[in-house]
Amino acid sequence: LVLLLTSIASHEGMLRNALLWLAVIAVAAGKAALGHAADAGIASAAIGMHTLHVLVTSVWGGLALSAGLAVLPALDTSTARGVLIRTAGQVSSVSLVAVVFVLLTGAFNAARGSGGSFEAIDASTWGHVLVLKLALVALALVLGGLNRFSALPRLRRSASTVDAHTFNNVMYLEALAMLGVFVAA
């Protein structure tokens, strides 16, 4: 219904943007309400925190997937190198903010879901999936850190084709790791 109203609304209006954000939040809240957070009740802090977790994970994963699989490879020519460097910097900065929120909300969700017990993680399917997601997130964090602290500074200094390919290839691997996180979730 919200998406239908969005399509009817003006394409540049504030109402359309508000409706789109409402739809995004509704989808994230729906996803959160289908998971383990629903055990605490529909109007609970657990649902709110898990909704925020779904939203920020979508930002980080969406940026990684779109940048790694489509946008940055399309800018992989010497004539677009300046745009590639600016875009890579913006993707890295927004991703860093999203990652901080992913880790904070994820820690809250894990502590709440396990009751603070590592035994609950070890003895349950939910815990095994959580460990898999944590391993994939750790891989994505290592790849993102490699890009942010090694490949991107080199690319900014040299603007060379080799450094552009390095950044794009690592971003591609981060996108695959995030795809794995989404599949596991």
Predicted regions and their residues:
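Polytopic transmembrane helical bundles with strong interfacial aromatic enrichment
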Residues: 1-185
